[in-house]
Amino acid sequence: MTGDVVGGASGNIGGLIGHNFGGNTEYVVARGKVSGGNLSYVGGLVGYNDGDLSSAEASGDVSGGANSFVGGLVGTNGDFVDHRINSASAKGNVVGGSQSSVGGLVGQNNSFITNSLANGQVSGGTYARLGGLVGLNMGDLLNSVAYGNVKFVSNYAQSYGGLVGVN
């Protein structure tokens, strides 16, 4: 899929899928800018993932408003331990508002990420959690890498890391 996606507040916004609700998604590509408002789940491919993603790719800048979960590929990955992202990549700059979780690949991970990579600059507002791969990780990461810059602001009380902002 190629094209830009613009969403409002309190949504699940993805370049290809807004909410992957139990689906098994393989060999998919999304190219284009994706943006969402406050209190949103925003991803270059999937806004909110409650399924499995493999051999998936997203390229393009991704942005979200305050109190959002923003990722180059997926905004939030799963509330259960069996939602996996495998062999996936994201390329592009990812920006979130204040108190957001922002990652080059995934904004918030609650499950598994394996064999994946992110390449792009990550930035956010005050109190944001910024990670080159994952902004807020409460799951498992294996054999994955992040390239690019994590752009923090010293007086913004942010949590940031080259791979993960908060683990």
Segments and roles (model prediction):
Residues 1-167:
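Predominantly extracellular beta-rich ligand-binding scaffolds that present long acidic/polar faces
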